[in-house]
């Protein structure tokens, strides 16, 4: 079944009459909740082992690694040991776009398998590349090529949205161009719901339009003026509605991300508690 389980309740019209089924939706909570380690990047720089232990103690089951930060100075083997020690899973990592066109792309895919990644996700394109529709097209084609190699290794390549991806170039929204030009059988998408809102987009509309493309999610709340993110439940993003709209959600990584909290570990704890208690 999709995301929700259903049960049938029956009532008799009269004794001995036909029984009429009535389908009743059962409220759902997330089985697993991940944390994007960018949310606690300073703590990870200072003491990655202690930080991962704290993240697990909060109740998080998954983390999203940051290859783009060099995994905070640790080798893939060290990261693997740390994850196993804490009982954490790392379904994905954020990687720099240049890794797709490097000569050792296959080596990166092998490392992804070592770390248990299902996805390598590019968070954004180089600044100079994102100002031109032609460069967006070029990168979409590179994603298709790199994605084909990734699929042969059992890994998915994916793309994450930033607020400025929604800023039109001429009459075209570059994010839309990228989604339309990439091959769904080779490239998946990670929806950052807060970034979508801050960029002026509607996460629900994109979920409806590309429901089969989104396989990973950043849950992020946003202040009413859309100036920055905030703790979950303190902004105006309808997270419950979004979660309820995601098909097969228990099969898809869902991460908390808050980019600039005053106390990152305290906010991570509050965000987990909020999301873990949410019925949808």
Annotate each predicted stretch with a short phrase.
Residues 64-80:
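Glycine-rich, proline-tolerant flexible connector loops at the mouths of alpha/beta enzymes
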Residues 4-12, 16-19, 23-34, 40-56, ...:
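Histidine-acidic metal/acid-base catalytic patches
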Residues 38-40, 66-70, 95-98, 125-127, ...:
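Active-site beta-loop-alpha junctions enriched in small/polar residues
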Residues 10-11, 16, 62, 82, ...:
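Active-site acidic/histidine proton-transfer and metal-coordination neighborhood
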């Amino acid at each position: 079944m999709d995301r929700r389980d259903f049960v049938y309740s029956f009532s008799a019209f009269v004794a001995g009459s036909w029984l009429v089924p009535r389908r009743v939706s059962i409220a759902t909570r997330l089985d697993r909740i991940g944390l994007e380690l960018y949310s606690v990047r300073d703590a990870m720089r200072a003491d990655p082992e202690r930080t991962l232990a704290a993240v697990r103690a909060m109740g998080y089951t998954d983390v999203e690694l940051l290859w783009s930060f060099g995994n905070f100075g640790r080798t893939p083997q060290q990261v693997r040991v740390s994850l196993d020690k804490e009982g954490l899973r790392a379904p994905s990592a954020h990687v720099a776009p240049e890794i797709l066109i490097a000569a050792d792309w296959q080596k990166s895919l092998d490392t992804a398998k070592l770390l248990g990644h299902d996805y390598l996700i590019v968070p954004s394109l180089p600044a100079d590349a994102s100002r031109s529709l032609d460069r967006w097209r070029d990168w979409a084609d590179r994603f298709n090529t790199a994605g084909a190699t990734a699929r042969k290794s059992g890994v998915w390549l994916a793309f994450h949205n930033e607020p400025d991806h929604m800023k039109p170039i001429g009459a075209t929204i570059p994010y839309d161009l990228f989604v339309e030009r990439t091959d769904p059988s080779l490239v998946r998408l990670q929806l950052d719901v807060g970034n979508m809102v801050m960029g002026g987009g509607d996460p629900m509309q994109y979920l409806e339009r590309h429901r089969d493309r989104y396989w990973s999610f950043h849950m992020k709340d946003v202040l009413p003026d859309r100036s920055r993110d905030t703790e979950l439940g303190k902004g105006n993003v309808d997270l419950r509605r979004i979660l309820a709209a995601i098909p097969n959600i228990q099969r898809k990584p869902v991460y908390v991300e808050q980019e600039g909290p005053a106390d990152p570990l305290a906010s991570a704890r509050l965000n987990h508690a909020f999301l873990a208690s949410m019925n949808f």
